[in-house]
């Protein structure tokens, strides 16, 4: 590879990296307007009303990705909080077993990576992929036939591990 080709490749890589940073939702400053959020981040994958007249813009990289970013706006349309919600620190704080319903799960985490059934539970298990220090993991939320969250847990994604 010639020096010119290496420089061109380096420029493309740097430009791609900077473009990726420009659309990182966590870089959106508090107080930004809804219009600014949409201009910087594009159309959200979902929107949800919040108490008090606010709105949640949800940017999910699922099913292939590992992040779901929630951008919360107040009633005046200004950003109050931006949070990457697929984070083990937040699961025990956010998930409310025996209280949350499907709509609460969707409003917080978006559409799941996968919906399955297991013989030990009468209902469905929704799962999301995320990373813990670059280790692929799953969040599993168990929803009963009435649409109520009954329990949740995390687990390693063993399909991506390499055992030598």
Where are these regions (language model features)?
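Bacterial N-terminal signal peptides that target proteins for export
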Residues: 1-10
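Beta-turn initiation residues at beta-strand->coil junctions
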Residues: 83-84, 154
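A cross-family detector of function-defining hotspots
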Residues: 26-78, 97-164
